[in-house]
Amino acid sequence: MKFVDEVSIRVKAGDGGNGCMSFRREKFIENGGPNGGDGGDGGSVYMIADENLNTLVDYRYTRHHEAQRGSNGGSTDCTGKKGEDLFLRVPVGTTVIDASTQEVIGDLVTPGQKLMVAQGGWHGLGNTRFKSSTNRAPRQTTPGKPGEQRDLKMEMKVLADVGLLGLPNAGKSTFIRSVSAAKPKVADYPFTTLVPNLGVVSVDRWKSFVIADIPGLIEGASEGAGLGIRFLKHLARTRVLLHLVDIAPLDESSPADAAEVIVNELTRFSPSLAERERWLVLNKADMVMDDERDERVQEVIDRLEWEGPVYVISAISKQGTDKLSHDLMRYLEDRADRLANDPAYAEELADLDQRIEDEARAQLQALDDARTLRRTGVKSVHDIGDDDGWDDDFEDDEDGPEIIYVRD
């Protein structure tokens, strides 16, 4: 299945139905009064968070969505039928943005959550509405109001408690396979992981948390190297980050250099995301001798001037993974308790979350504008005319805002 986490669509709410001009005409009632009914309201467009969806691929090929128009009013004071609302189902974790103003319309973060994105047009009035003591036979009606039309950008972020980041082949996918039932592809070449993978880590029968594995970063990712930094947005809503470092790389490169690359790329993407609680996890400890392992671990700690938690593990042999999982669960529980009981801490985290969202969105918008400039010479997608920015030749639109990878 294709994994799409960003799409642009146009939604149009239904227009309101027109009011009717009609007069009562029956036998023996030659001059009956007005009886024209009102039109029906136009249908609105809603988005609903569906926990069974994990991609926005359906909206890549169908970009125009329109709700039903309200019916016109009828004679004998018949009111027109309301247009049917249009419900668009999207994955949980989808942010809906007005493409013209960059205003966030809403976040769909809970299953079943509903968000109106386009208001249906108001119904027109029939001539009955204009009857008065001085105007017994009004010939005045009003047309229905047009439904709201919007160009929207939808961004999906996976919802997870813990996020993994590191260079390609740092062992992120092996780690998530080790601690959960998820089975992401594992191989001995870079960029084995092309899309985010989620796994549920069960610490005991009643306690669990969700962990997210994203494609690896390389030096220069913020300038587009490798798979770029777009996938870092999926870490924006995590509660803690695990920075995995391979201390036994096959190319005999420096683990300290590798760790420093990740910190630099993370900071370039979002300085606030770099402030998120982050634990250092040094992987593949079973592949080096104890003395050499300790030396490499200390080198990484010294290079990063690290003062946070440090774990030395082997994901493939599950050495140290149980302790790490239990410590993560304990941290998440303590964090939840503190959020509930410490308003100042809750406010501090809310401010951090908002800064992360704003910085991530600004970074992604800058990448989109740069790509648009390369393709069209237009400085920003917002400078494109009303219909000029809509290219229905999807197969050739390789540089659009949608990012597509194939999930094996």
Curated annotation (Swiss-Prot):
- Quaternary form? Monomer.
Task: Name the NCBIfam families for this protein.
Answer: Obg_CgtA (TIGR02729), PRK12297.1 (NF008955), PRK12299.1 (NF008956)
Which InterPro entries would you find in this protein's record? G_OBG, GTP-bd, GTP-bd_Obg/CgtA, GTP1-OBG_CS, GTP1_OBG_dom, GTP1_OBG_dom_sf, OBG_GTPase, P-loop_NTPase
Q: Which PANTHER family match?
A: DEVELOPMENTALLY REGULATED GTP-BINDING PROTEIN-RELATED, MITOCHONDRIAL RIBOSOME-ASSOCIATED GTPASE 2
* Residues covered by region (Disordered): 127-148, 385-408
Membrane-spanning segments: none
Protein name, please?
GTPase Obg
Question: Which GO terms label this protein's molecular function in UniProt?
Answer: GTP binding; GTPase activity; magnesium ion binding
What job does this protein perform?
An essential GTPase which binds GTP, GDP and possibly (p)ppGpp with moderate affinity, with high nucleotide exchange rates and a fairly low GTP hydrolysis rate. Plays a role in control of the cell cycle, stress response, ribosome biogenesis and in those bacteria that undergo differentiation, in morphogenesis control.
Cofactor dependence is on: Mg(2+)
Any idea where the Obg domain is?
1-159
Indicate, by first and last residue, each region the UniProt record lists as having compositional bias (Polar residues).
129-143
Query: Record's SUPFAM superfamilies?
Result: Obg GTP-binding protein N-terminal domain (SSF82051), P-loop containing nucleoside triphosphate hydrolases (SSF52540)
This entry carries the following GO cellular component terms, namely: cytoplasm
- For this protein, the Enzyme Commission number is 3.6.5.-
Instruction: Summarize where GTP binds, as residue positions.
Output: 166-173, 191-195, 213-216, 283-286, 314-316
Work out whether the entry's keyword set contains Lyase: no
